[in-house]
Amino acid sequence: MKLNPSKCVFGVTAGKFLGFMVSQRGIEVNSEKVRAILELEPLRTVKAMQSLNGKVAALNRFVSKATNKCLPFFQVLKKSFEWTDECQKAFEDLKKYLSSPPLLSPSMPEEELYLYIAVLQAAVSAALVRDEGSLQRPVYFISRAF
């Protein structure tokens, strides 16, 4: 195996890995990906809506009940595109949530994990968490629409 020295980093406590910020504290969302969503204006075209959905999909593991939060966006794509008040509220709520996204905690081998499942009318969501003292820290979020 050959390593490219200019691409190698040794002895660091944090860094970008596969698009995420990894540190001793856990896995953080890449701030550039969040900024791309936070700086968006209300969407005017189907293409812009598809772009937003792609950006949110890249951050799904950090967003609790992501499908439920983004359901108005999916519904607009199925019909003729119209930015509704419901879309605007969902967009603002998503921006508010992403302004302070959770830190995902790494799990340890043989550690006991807990899975919380929420079944809603149009989506199912799950949160994988671990105990850290008296707190429960998120490990991973997942959600799907019906």
Would you name each region that the model predicts?
Residues 34, 81, 120-122, 146:
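Conserved beta-strand elements of beta-rich interaction domains across eukaryotes
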Residues 120-130:
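Acidic, metal-ligating active-site segments
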Residues 17, 123-124, 135:
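Eukaryotic short linear interaction motifs
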Residues 134-146:
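A short, polar/acidic, helix/strand-boundary loop motif
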